[in-house]
Structures are given as C-alpha cells and as structure tokens.
Amino acid sequence: MEAAAATPRPRLFLLMLAAAATLVPEATPLQCFCHLCTKDNFTCVTDGLCFVSVTETTDKVIHNSMCIAEIDLIPRDRPFVCAPSSKTGSITTTYCCNQDHCNKIELPTVGKPSSGLGPVELAAVIAGPVCFVCISLMLMVYICHNRTVIHHRVPNEEDPSLDRPFISEGTTLKDLIYDMTTSGSGSGLPLLVQRTIARTIVLQESIGKGRFGEVWRGKWRGEEVAVKIFSSREERSWFREAEIYQTVMLRHENILGFIAADNKDNGTWTQLWLVSDYHEHGSLFDYLNRYTVTVEGMIKLALSTASGLAHLHMEIVGTQGKPAIAHRDLKSKNILVKKNGTCCIADLGLAVRHDSATDTIDIAPNHRVGTKRYMAPEVLDDSINMKHFESFKRADIYAMGLVFWEVARRCSIGGIHEDYQLPYYDLVPSDPSVEEMRKVVCEQKLRPNIPNRWQSCEALRVMAKIMRECWYANGAARLTALRIKKTLSQLSQQEGIKM
C-alpha cells in the first residue's frame, strides 16, 4: 500500500493518456475482468469498454473492475465515466480500455487526500455543493410541476385554460372538423389547433399495444378520443401515417377520423402522438371474436368496409382533389367497428399515394411490410409490379376478400355459425412465414374454405361469390372496390337494410 502511494504522478498521467487514446471500442464484444462476477470466472462481456477504478478516502482504498456498455459511453469521444474525479474526502482514479482483460491491472494510488483546509476554504467546500443541490432540487420541482408526465401516471383533470386562446369554450371536435371540411383546405386542422388539442388531452387507460407502440383512450373537454403513441424509433411510421391522414379530401365516414398529430417531449423522452376518433368496440378482429352477427350486421360490416376502401382507391380530380391511395396492410385488426355497426378503415402507416399527373407512387421509406397472412399471391411470389399503382389496389382487394370471409363465418342463421378463425388457420401456423404462405397460396393455390351452409342463404351466397372473385391468382381479374360496394349496396336494398 505504501509502495503504491509512493508511485509518482507521471505514471498516472501516462495511464490517463493511454485511456484517452483507446476510448473507441471495437465492434467485436470485449471480455473484461469483473471483480463481482464470481459465477462467470470473474469475466464479463460488453460492446463498450473495460473499466477499472480506485477510490481513496481518508481511511480506505476501494478497487472496482467491470464492463461499461456502449450505450453508457456519453459523450462518445470522451465518456464521463472514464474521467477521474475528486470529492471532499475522496479521490477516484479511472482507466478505460478496449482490449480483452485490459482492466486486470492495479491502478496506482496518489496518497491520502488532504483534509487540512483552512476555515474559509472548508466553508466554501461545504457551501458550494449544498447550494448546487438546493438549486438543482428547486429546478427539478419546478419542471415536474409544470410538465404532465403521462407514461407512469394519468392526471386527474385537464387544464382547459391552455386551449382558450385558440379554441373557444363550448367548441366540440365535431364543430372543429366540420369547419375544417367546409371552409378549410380539406387537409386537416391547422397545426396550431392540432397541437393545442393534443396538449390538453388527458389519457385515461391503455387499450392496446402493437409493433408501433401503444393505443390509449383519452379525453378532450369530456369527449373520448383514441391516442396512438409511437415510440421515437417509429418516427417514420408516425410521420407517414399523419401525412396520409392529412391528404386533401380523405375524410370519409368509413375511414378513421383523424384529429391531430403532435410530438410531446416530457423532458426525458419524446413521444409521437396521433389522435383520432375513439370507437369502443375496438377492431373488427376483437368484435368478431366476441360476437356473432346477423345477416343485416354482416352486410353493414362488409358494405362499410368496401365503401371505405373504394374512397381510398378513388382519385378525385380538381383543385381540392384527392389522389388515389392503396392501403397495403388491410386486415381485420386494422378495421374498427363503430357504435352503429359499421366499419372504418384505420392504420394508414403503410399506405401509398398515386400521382396521376406523373404516374408515380410515393412509396414511403419504411422498413415495415404488410401482414404475411393477408398478402396477395403476387406479393408472396414477388411478381408484383411495384411501379404500377393498380397492383397495390388489387392486393388490397385480395385482403378484403379474406376479411369478408372472417365476417361471414360469424353470421348466425337459425343459431348456426362458425367459430371465429383467421384466414388459412387450418393450413399455416399462427405466425406463418412468407415461404409458408407462398407454398399454400401460390403453389397449392388454396383459399379459405367456404362452408356448404352458405348456399342456403342469399346474402351468404353473394358474399361467397364476392370472395372468390377477390381471390383470383391473376390480380387483373379481381373485382374493384367500387364494384364490390355497388353489389353489396344492391344486396342491402334487397334485404331492406338502411345504412
């Protein structure tokens, strides 16, 4: 111990210089000496750096050896954790390196820290940290008081005063959206209004999770809304979906009503919000799992879905026109059921728009792909023409045929109905690969089974015919969304159904 204390300071300086020269870790995992890892032969593995330190106090010396993960190397070029430090009564010497077991060394000590401070110096040493801690605590209390932390707790009440300068008292979401569709650009609420709404929403409960993040039920001025919260990793998906929802003239009763998009920074992390209408029945997938449907209910679900897709696919020409849009991820989990028993299409994060003037498609730079179970044959075998917009519309039609099959199975006639199942449930595993789906759909040319009982009911017979014409291997032979909508409209009139 005394010999170590006598080691000159130049050696410590050279060690620190060597540490600074080796701060950038290699790509391969490091094996480091770890004095606490008794079960692993005193060895740990990291993608960052090996670390060793010695802390000297007035009465003892503490040695520490371990791994530092790459994520903890802040800033990257000169991490704080690798810098020596000193506090009253203790001195810590550190060394970081990036070679296997390079931290299996004993750092030199610099001698016991001196405590021989004069009265003035001692007062300054004590008062400085105390003042710093007090100021820091006051600052933290102020920040916490003025921010709404939404992830871990739900506030008891909203602060309506925040939106008064922009949105008058008594204004409802329906009023705002009506004003926007009749007198605005038709491309969504102004950004300031969107931000004002988003920042005065009170989250109530989490109602679902997905690959993008979470969905919450929230309240704005007593009205229920759905809040889709994307993690910061999914910024592209959030931006793309918000962009598509704000396409001119997109609003339609059978497409999920978009309200606002905002990025909310709570001081620790950024959350990306997408606010929309709330539908308590949830997705069509959830609805069909819980309930059977009547013939009328089946037709309403199918016709409203076809109406929403027909509006998406349709191009509206004019100064306030709308480009044709293909969904690319249509499935029962991305269709919501409204209170009146009709559907609206949601989750437009993968959608693509067609510019007819230049005949181009704005395919988003997004790593996500559609759901394998609902992929059309030409998508599965990679024969789809990505430059031809009609190809994407035809793939949507194939997927809608599968959704219709899910709905028709739950149609109860005389108390007889099938259990809810996903398409191809009897032919592929629960999470099929593209190869498994390709073998069934493209090679074996199989499609979901249509029960014989459907032939005894006119409505089910029409539904079965539509499905078959949606499932053709040749995409060009499939029905269009508009044709399906017209066929189902005629069926609803025959059945005396009022939509």
Swiss-Prot record:
Q: Residue ranges, Cytoplasmic compartment?
A: 144-499
Q: Which CDD domains match?
A: STKc_TGFbR1_ACVR1b_ACVR1c (cd14143), TFP_LU_ECD_ALK5 (cd23537)
Catalyses: L-threonyl-[receptor-protein] + ATP = O-phospho-L-threonyl-[receptor-protein] + ADP + H(+); L-seryl-[receptor-protein] + ATP = O-phospho-L-seryl-[receptor-protein] + ADP + H(+)
Cysteine pairings via disulfide bonds: C32-C50, C34-C37, C44-C67, C82-C96, C97-C102
Q: Start and end of every GS domain?
A: 171-200
The record's annotation in PROSITE patterns points to: GS, PROTEIN_KINASE_ATP, PROTEIN_KINASE_DOM, PROTEIN_KINASE_ST
Record-level GO BP terms = activin receptor signaling pathway; apoptotic process; cardiac epithelial to mesenchymal transition; cellular response to growth factor stimulus; cellular response to transforming growth factor beta stimulus; endothelial cell activation; heart development; intracellular signal transduction
Can you give the residue ranges of the Protein kinase domain?
201-491
A Gene Ontology MF term for this entry? transforming growth factor beta binding
Report one GO cellular component.
nucleus
Q: Tell me which SMART domains the record gives.
A: GS, S_TKc
* Membrane topology annotation: Single-pass type I membrane protein
Q: Where are the transmembrane segments?
A: 123-143
Recorded hits in InterPro entries, A to Z, give: Activin_recp, GS_dom, Kinase-like_dom_sf, Prot_kinase_dom, Protein_kinase_ATP_BS, Ser/Thr_kinase_AS, Snake_toxin-like_sf, TGFB_receptor
Q: Where in the cell is it found?
A: Cell membrane; Cell junction, Tight junction; Membrane raft; Cell surface
| Activity regulation text | Kept in an inactive conformation by FKBP1A preventing receptor activation in absence of ligand. CD109 is another inhibitor of the receptor.
Q: Which residues carry this modification: Phosphoserine?
A: S161, S183, S185, S187
Residues of the active site are: D329 (proton acceptor)
Identify the residue ranges that face the Extracellular compartment according to the record.
30-122
Task: Identify the residue span(s) of motif FKBP1A-binding.
Answer: 189-190
Q: Which family does it belong to?
A: Belongs to the protein kinase superfamily. TKL Ser/Thr protein kinase family. TGFB receptor subfamily.
Known role: Transmembrane serine/threonine kinase forming with the TGF-beta type II serine/threonine kinase receptor, TGFBR2, the non-promiscuous receptor for the TGF-beta cytokines TGFB1, TGFB2 and TGFB3. Transduces the TGFB1, TGFB2 and TGFB3 signal from the cell surface to the cytoplasm and is thus regulating a plethora of physiological and pathological processes including cell cycle arrest in epithelial and hematopoietic cells, control of mesenchymal cell proliferation and differentiation, wound healing, extracellular matrix production, immunosuppression and carcinogenesis.
This one is known as TGF-beta receptor type-1
- What are the top taxonomic ranks of the organism? Eukaryota, Metazoa, Chordata, Craniata, Vertebrata
